[in-house]
């Protein structure tokens, strides 16, 4: 999986979620 430039510690993945990224271990991964 490729780490996206967004974290999801306090809020879920937002912008990167539109690119197919999902939360994993506090970081958004594609």
Swiss-Prot record:
Give yes or no: UniProt keyword Secreted.
no
Explain the post-translational modification. Answer: This is a cyclic peptide.
Q: In which tissues is it expressed?
A: Detected in stems (at protein level).
- What domain notes does the record hold? The presence of a 'disulfide through disulfide knot' structurally defines this protein as a knottin.
Q: Name one Pfam family in it.
A: Cyclotide
| GO biological process entries | cytolysis in another organism; defense response
Q: Which organism is it from?
A: Pigea enneasperma (Spade flower)
Q: Does the keyword Disulfide bond apply?
A: yes
Which InterPro entries does the UniProt entry name for this protein? Cyclotide, Cyclotide_bracelet_CS, Cyclotide_sf
From the Swiss-Prot or TrEMBL record, give the protein name: Cyclotide hyen-M
Disulfide pairs here are 4-21, 8-23, 13-28
Q: Where is this cross-link: Cyclopeptide (Ser-Asn)?
A: 1-30
Biological role: Probably participates in a plant defense mechanism. Has cytotoxic activity against HUVEC cells (LC(50)= 1.83 uM) and various cancer cells including HeLa (LC(50)= 1.81 uM), MCF-7 and K562. Displays very weak hemolytic activity.
UniProt keyword annotations, A-Z: Disulfide bond, Knottin, Plant defense
Q: Which family does it belong to?
A: Belongs to the cyclotide family. Bracelet subfamily.
